[in-house]
Amino acid sequence: MASVHGITVKNAQGEDTPLSNYQGKVLIIVNVASQCGLTNSNYNQFKELLDVYKKDGLEVLAFPCNQFGGQEPSCEIDIAAFVADKFKFEPTLFQKIDVNGDNTAPLYKFLKQEKGGFLVDAIKWNFTKFLVGRDGHVIKRFSPTTEPKDMKKDIEAALQAKL
């Protein structure tokens, strides 16, 4: 697999979605959970980032995951409704996946190969963020505690790179 563009994932409705649909875009790929202490700040700041940078080609791809403290027990429809209602935000939401272990989604295998974590490659918690360039390669991996607003400099650099 040369880039994320060679991977197909399932959207929140369960339909195959090739990530090649996002070729030429800068992506934030993030594992999300509705009942996490990091939920509010991340969703609010993702919305703010998209309000500013979507016109330049930024997309946030949110992958619900229930592997950390069981903090995403809901189905995709309920997750989308929760985020839209509470945050007035409609991220591009995909089907719930595993990001670690035997059933790790192919996308997350690729992301972790491209940018391993500190000490271990495993995703450590909800809201681990990967910034992916227009070419489909991971530019940087951000820890769960990194706030989206603190990614601005890297996002702007990625948006300016016309690969």
Curated annotation (Swiss-Prot):
Keywords: Cytoplasm, Oxidoreductase, Peroxidase. One of its GO terms (molecular function) is glutathione peroxidase activity. The keyword Cytoplasm applies. It catalyses: 2 glutathione + H2O2 = glutathione disulfide + 2 H2O. May constitute a glutathione peroxidase-like protective system against oxidative stresses. Belongs to the glutathione peroxidase family. The gene is gpx-2. One of its GO terms (cellular component) is cytoplasm. This is Glutathione peroxidase 2. The lineage of its organism: Eukaryota, Metazoa, Ecdysozoa, Nematoda, Chromadorea.
